[in-house]
């Protein structure tokens, strides 16, 4: 019986590598493609555009004796290097600046949450989207009527900015 158990153990250990992956079980902190929505009060159209954001897992620790000791600071996935892209919202009322700037992640790293450029809140029940008026996907085939060309939706990005 012991020999059978040993043989079974060897068989399980030798085939265990076939199930294991060299990649981490959860994706680590890195830039990922995302669709964000841009809107502004006074502009009737919400524009969705593709960008990169920082997302993924950072290692963290939890104290066993939480009631006695203070909680440990938790790492979150932050922007390391970023640049800003300007999106022009079509159909804005006169006197309303139609340009909205959005971040584009160039690189990411784990660290303490910095409220100056990160959303440190918990998960939301609803996805981020437009609160005002109509929705216009920047990748749709039909651009808004008042644009002379679809390239007016995206303006050139500023040079890279490294948050402090």
Curated annotation (Swiss-Prot):
Protein name per Swiss-Prot or TrEMBL: Choriogonadotropin subunit beta
Entry keyword set: Disulfide bond, Glycoprotein, Hormone, Secreted, Signal
Subunit structure as annotated in this protein's UniProt entry: Heterodimer of a common alpha chain and a unique beta chain which confers biological specificity to thyrotropin, lutropin, follitropin and gonadotropin.
Disulfide bonds: 29-77, 43-92, 46-130, 54-108, 58-110, 113-120
Organism encoding this protein: Callithrix jacchus
GO molecular function ontology, one term from the record: hormone activity
Locations listed in the record: Secreted
GO CC term, one of those recorded: extracellular space
PROSITE patterns in the cross-refs: GLYCO_HORMONE_BETA_1, GLYCO_HORMONE_BETA_2
């Amino acid at each position: 019986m012991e020999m059978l158990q040993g043989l079974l153990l060897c068989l399980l250990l030798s085939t265990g590598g076939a199930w294991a992956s060299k990649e981490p079980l959860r994706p680590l902190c890195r830039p990922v493609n995302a669709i964000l929505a841009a809107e502004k009060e006074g502009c009737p159209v919400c524009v969705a555009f593709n960008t990169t954001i920082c997302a993924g897992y950072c290692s963290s620790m939890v104290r066993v004796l939480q009631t006695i000791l203070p909680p440990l600071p938790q790492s979150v996935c932050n922007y390391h290097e970023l640049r800003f892209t300007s999106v022009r919202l079509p159909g804005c009322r006169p006197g309303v600046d139609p340009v909205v700037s959005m971040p584009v992640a160039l690189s990411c790293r784990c660290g303490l949450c910095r409220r100056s450029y990160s959303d440190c809140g918990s998960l939301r029940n609803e996805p981020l989207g437009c609160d005002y008026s109509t929705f216009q996907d920047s990748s749709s085939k039909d651009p808004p009527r008042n644009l002379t060309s679809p390239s007016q939706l995206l303006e050139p990005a500023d040079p890279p900015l490294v948050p402090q």
